[in-house]
Amino acid sequence: MRLSHVILGEILYYDPEFEKEVDKIVDLGGKHLGSGDYGSAYLLNGRVYKVTTDEIELEHAEILKGKKTNNFARIYEVEVINPKLGIIQMEVLGEFRGEIPDEWVENVNREAEQHGIDPDELDIRPSNIMVNQKK
């Protein structure tokens, strides 16, 4: 068993449910893409599977699931295991490099509001921005 930590606020703890979900994806051949404050992302069958403990992210993913948007990753499926653990299946995007244009942030905030998402709940920072490599 691998030991990993999930960071929630300032508390580090081992979450066996999180590890169980990660292990399922890895056992199916998922390739680790990266980890952040609240989860880890894996590439499997041409999609990104993100295991997250961020309940707000899960709520946003549920709202965006199946919708075509201009500024958010396409969400195919959302599996909520419990309010603080879930798996989001989304499109594969490329890494963003550079500065975040103010106009883009304004567009994201506007689109979030159109979908009923509070823009103040968005975590806009370079490490959370991905780009569509096909465009």
Regions found by a protein language model. Name each.
Residues M1-G9:
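Short acidic, low-complexity intrinsically disordered linear motifs used
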Residues L8-K31:
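Juxta-kinase regulatory segment immediately upstream of eukaryotic protein kinase catalytic domains
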Residues G29-G66:
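ATP-binding glycine-rich loop module of kinase domains
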Residues L43-G46, V92, N132:
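Active-site beta-strand termini and strand-to-loop segments that position acidic
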Residues N70-V108:
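Conserved structural core of kinase catalytic domains
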Residues D102-D120:
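A generic "structured core" feature
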Residues Q114-N132:
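Catalytic-loop of the protein kinase fold
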